[in-house]
């Protein structure tokens, strides 16, 4: 059934829709299956994403038609399709009337992903009007809170050197805490790897007090504050809260140094919102494990990593992993810096839409996945700043001297870039950074040809 007469209006102007402030606008890359017209398929897509079904129904009235989602722009050659969703379509909380992300996902990326006349459709951007921004939680804390704890300026406080305890699984409580202490002697921030929680060989209630003791000893030894991001991911709301409450009890007077990590993609928006609302005083660390199933450029359905990050800010993530923009081991490109810009700035041009955040707190870009001191200068140069958290597991524990030396090499790498220094020349005066060349020789050979001769290192 051709529904284009009802669910498409190509006379609508995007600037008028934005000015009106009554719609969420969503841009997709959509291709219909062979034999289906582009506008017909697009209209069916909008119908399935809002008020429609596959036949006319007698219960439809004029009000229903007033909240139809409308296709307002198509370009078949580029596969561009844009749809305007009236705000009235979206579910609101009974308790406080606020928007919920699950409703946005249910409509804008729900049944339309399995339609028989659609070859593929992927969300690449969305626009949220001011009223909608006001109705989402947004972050309660941001990187400025961490800078304050670390004794830094709360504006442009700079790079936070972090790690992931490695190996990701298999360490028992004492070795785990020892690994944390070794890194904290040189670094700032440690996170649980996403599978780490309450394994039988490393029970949470045994390992966490040891981690806190390691933090206190490292703080005493260095005179510097330390940060720990604990995984509270669980299937059940009460289990999440039980883990979080126990951690707050253990850390006691140092609870401000405790962040809560949630696997927001596999756990879903409900997990993120639970952490945001139950623990607004803690830094909310959004890990995105599994996201590549839909965000990968090779996937033609779902949504992009940009969309995921933008949604995380609405939900209230204090920080989210954004990959390494082609400088680490994970899939990505240098142009992915737009992801960081969108979540950290108060206004930003996305792939399609210019988004204003109207004072909503920023979400920190968290950089992770194959990074080390040699790769960081190029990363910072591409991004244009160093106000990020970097969790370098192998880049710390793979350092030839020690995890502490690995952490120091990361800090030195940031200082090298900040000073605009030549990395080889900088290494001659900074031992830990210099030893990173020997620790990661394949990267050194690729990034800095001739480094062995210049640094006096031989095979």
Curated annotation (Swiss-Prot):
InterPro entries: RuBisCO (IPR033966), RuBisCo_large_chain_AS (IPR020878), RuBisCO_lsu_C (IPR000685), RuBisCO_lsu_C_sf (IPR036376), RuBisCO_lsu_fd_N (IPR017443), RuBisCO_lsu_N_sf (IPR036422), RuBisCO_lsuII (IPR020871). GO terms for biological process: reductive pentose-phosphate cycle. It comes from the Bacteria. Keywords: Calvin cycle, Carbon dioxide fixation, Lyase, Magnesium, Metal-binding, Monooxygenase, Oxidoreductase. It catalyses: 2 (2R)-3-phosphoglycerate + 2 H(+) = D-ribulose 1,5-bisphosphate + CO2 + H2O; D-ribulose 1,5-bisphosphate + O2 = 2-phosphoglycolate + (2R)-3-phosphoglycerate + 2 H(+). Binds 1 Mg(2+) ion per subunit. Its cofactor is Mg(2+). Belongs to the RuBisCO large chain family. Type II subfamily. This is Ribulose bisphosphate carboxylase. It comes from Thiobacillus denitrificans (strain ATCC 25259 / T1). The gene is cbbM.
